[in-house]
């Protein structure tokens, strides 16, 4: 296994499972957002779908990304170069997944702002900016885990303040959306989402600098996290209300420190559960396939968006429950088969 920078790292089955499950949850939530009719979206099924596509997805991707960035020994220039490439790749993906829609805009069939779709602040653009920022912070903070942890808290805490501050002359709205703000095309801005990268980064450094923590057996961890699980379960209604409301100053995309804290508690509890699954069932064939999905997360993320994004031009908010289920299986199978084909072509 290699990290984002080509450094050799021993394959982590738990991380692969986390990412694999996240991809599956991600596909269904994108279908719920794009395809499903408003009445289904507003139902308990819709709220459940959005919750599964909330803390189980983006925070997992970003925290795992931060965790493995802490392994990297690459210089700043590599972080900057990789960050720029990822950011530009995100813009290219925005364009490609909206190709059907953009063609109709060009043809005059739809009167929409094309930049809304091309300059959407999504996960890939966030990953690129996160690499840039992390590369710079590594020079200043070195391996001081507490500085990354405090920075994560600050990023999450000031996000609502930045959103309320609104526009500045330095950053026009289309570009400010990548950093902060509640514009409709600002899905994953740096504030607050970079906080999860920093949380994962600091978590890895804490473990590295506290060998005792790594030696705690899974049974002891389960006992420690029983109160955390209880707290997470009791407060699911609070979290679900946020994950079901995507936009606006109090929505999922622009949440503040309270939801960030809840997600961290959830991630730690969820990590213990997935670690337990890996220890007891890690050799299972189905879970092995989920791990493969996790290993190919970036490629599968791109493929599923190319499929869903272009179909959404025709199917936007028009599908019922059974159609949603059908589309989930179809898109998931198509994504995986395409990924297998691409993987085979890429092999020497």
Language-model-derived ranges and their functions:
Residues 1-348:
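Alpha-helical transmembrane segments and their immediate juxtamembrane cytosolic regions
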């Amino acid at each position: 296994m290699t990290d984002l920078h080509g450094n050799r790292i021993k394959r982590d089955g738990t991380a692969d499972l986390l990412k694999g499950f996240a991809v599956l949850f991600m596909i269904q939530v994108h279908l719920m957002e794009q395809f499903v009719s408003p009445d289904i979206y507003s139902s308990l099924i819709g709220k459940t779908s959005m919750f599964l596509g909330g803390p189980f997805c983006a925070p997992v991707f970003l925290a795992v990304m931060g965790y493995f960035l802490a392994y990297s020994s690459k210089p700043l220039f590599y972080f900057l170069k990789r960050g720029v490439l990822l950011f530009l790749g995100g813009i290219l993906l925005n364009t490609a997944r909206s190709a059907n829609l953009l063609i109709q805009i060009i043809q005059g069939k739809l009167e929409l702002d094309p930049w809304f779709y091309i300059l959407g602040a999504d996960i890939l653009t966030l990953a690129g900016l996160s690499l840039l920022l992390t590369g710079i912070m590594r020079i200043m903070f070195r391996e001081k885990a507490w500085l990354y942890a405090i920075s994560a808290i600050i990023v999450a805490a000031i996000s609502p303040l930045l959103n309320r501050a609104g526009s500045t002359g330095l950053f026009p709205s289309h570009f400010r959306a990548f950093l902060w703000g509640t514009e409709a095309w600002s899905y994953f801005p740096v504030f607050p989402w970079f906080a999860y990268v920093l949380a994962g980064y600091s978590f890895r450094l804490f473990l590295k600098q506290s060998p005792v923590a790594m030696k705690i057996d899974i049974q002891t961890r389960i006992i420690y996290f029983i109160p955390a699980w209880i707290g997470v379960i009791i407060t699911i209604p609070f979290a679900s209300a946020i994950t079901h409301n995507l936009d606006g100053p109090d929505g999922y995309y622009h949440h503040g420190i309270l939801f960030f804290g809840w997600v961290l508690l959830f991630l730690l509890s969820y990590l213990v559960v997935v670690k337990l699954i890996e220890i007891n069932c890690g050799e299972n064939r189905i879970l092995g396939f989920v791990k493969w999905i996790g290993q190919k997360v970036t490629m599968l993320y791109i493929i599923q968006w190319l499929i869903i994004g272009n179909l959404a031009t025709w199917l936007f908010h028009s599908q019922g429950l059974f159609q949603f289920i059908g589309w989930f299986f179809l898109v998931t199978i198509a994504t995986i088969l395409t990924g297998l084909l691409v993987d085979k072509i890429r092999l020497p």
